[in-house]
């Protein structure tokens, strides 16, 4: 099967109608973090002064005072027109796995390190955010992964991932054995420290550190990156996003394993289990300030060289 480079299915980015308006906005952030709390307080004050109804995720609401409605992520997804996540990419990933099912627009204020998914600066967000709230923004859909663990043909655990699903041993630096199938066609057996199955969104995260290629967000593709394979010939491979990836763990593995979703959610895996990873029907709807440039983000975050002439 060839890789589908038709970026129009589904559409990766579109300009939103200038008449789009937001009314109820949810605030989400990293709990017990001084910088995040300061930004959340500024956001809450600024948004309420603009006349918006503001809800705060319950883990951060207690640090914002008493005059704010505290709700969980599910209620933010159900009631809000926009969610603002303050923190790093990890905070965005945690919120996105819940909010993607609501098709809620999400924008980030960077209080982390690299901040590939968080566009707004924490100390000067007002001007850019005001334009977004006036309808001047771009939207971009990022697909998620669905990871399932089967034991003796029965589904034992499942979850979703925005960046990657990783099969790995319970112990650090311990080799495991497994087979990999693409759409039920045997690809190879592996003796490695694990396998990273990444979306284009995750290709600048763990997969990049493991030697994988960067995939632009509009590609409908997945990248499989073996972790320290016990062979010189095994390299990352890119497959169509419609592919179903199956990994069968050897019964001879002498310990328990895990599938980690974005490094946050861990699914228990036993020797002999099968792991199925496929594209989820859920998509993250990212909101960017108008004119957002992905390659500018790469240059800035990864320290690439600027134009020579």
UniProtKB/Swiss-Prot annotation:
Keyword annotations from UniProtKB, A to Z: ATP-binding, Cytoplasm, Kinase, NAD, NADP, Nucleotide-binding, Transferase
Catalytic activity, EC: 2.7.1.23
Cellular component annotations (GO), alphabetically ordered: cytoplasm
A Pfam family matched in the record: NAD_kinase
Principal place of residence: cytoplasm
Positions annotated to bind NAD(+): 89-90, 163-164, 174, 191, 193, 204-209
Enzyme class (EC, first level): transferase
Catalytic activity reported: NAD(+) + ATP = ADP + NADP(+) + H(+)
Location in the cell: Cytoplasm
The keyword Transferase is assigned to this record: yes
Gene3D superfamilies cross-referenced by the UniProt entry: Probable inorganic polyphosphate/atp-NAD kinase, domain 1, Probable inorganic polyphosphate/atp-NAD kinase, domain 2
PANTHER family given in the database record: NAD KINASE (PTHR20275:SF0)
Recorded family membership: Belongs to the NAD kinase family.
This protein's name: NAD kinase
Record organism: Shewanella sp. (strain W3-18-1)
The organism's taxonomic lineage, starting at the top: Bacteria, Pseudomonadati, Pseudomonadota, Gammaproteobacteria, Alteromonadales
Gene behind the chain: nadK
């Amino acid at each position: 099967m060839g890789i589908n480079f038709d970026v129009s299915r589904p559409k990766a980015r579109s300009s939103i109608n200038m008449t789009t308006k937001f009314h109820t906005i949810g605030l989400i952030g990293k709990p017990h973090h001084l910088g995040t709390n300061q930004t959340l307080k500024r956001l809450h004050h600024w948004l309420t002064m603009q006349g918006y109804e503001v809800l705060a995720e319950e883990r951060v609401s207690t640090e914002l005072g008493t005059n704010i409605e505290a709700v969980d992520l599910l209620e933010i997804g159900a009631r809000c027109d926009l969610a603002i996540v303050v923190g790093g990419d990890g905070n965005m990933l945690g919120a996105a796995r819940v909010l993607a099912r609501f098709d809620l627009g999400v924008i980030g204020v960077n209080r982390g390190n690299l901040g590939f998914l968080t566009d707004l600066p924490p100390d000067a967000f007002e001007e850019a955010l005001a334009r977004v709230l006036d309808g001047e923004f771009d939207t971009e859909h990022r697909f998620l992964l669905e990871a399932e663990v089967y034991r003796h043909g029965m589904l034992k655990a499942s979850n979703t991932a925005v960046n990657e699903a990783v099969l790995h041993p319970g112990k650090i630096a311990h080799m495991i054995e497994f087979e990999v199938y693409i759409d039920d066609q045997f690809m190879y057996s592996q003796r490695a420290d694990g396998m990273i199955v990444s979306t284009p969104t995750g290709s600048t995260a763990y997969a990049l550190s493991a030697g994988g290629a960067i995939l632009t967000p509009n590609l409908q593709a997945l990248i499989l990156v073996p972790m320290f394979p016990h062979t010189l010939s095994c390299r990352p491979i890119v497959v169509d996003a419609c592919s179903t990836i199956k990994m069968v763990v050897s019964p001879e593995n002498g310990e328990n394993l895990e599938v980690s979703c974005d490094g946050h959610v861990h699914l228990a895996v036993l020797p002999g289990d099968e792991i199925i990873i496929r594209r989820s029907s859920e998509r993250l709807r990212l909101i960017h300030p108008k004119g957002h440039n992905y390659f500018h983000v790469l240059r800035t975050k990864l320290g690439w060289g600027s134009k020579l002439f």
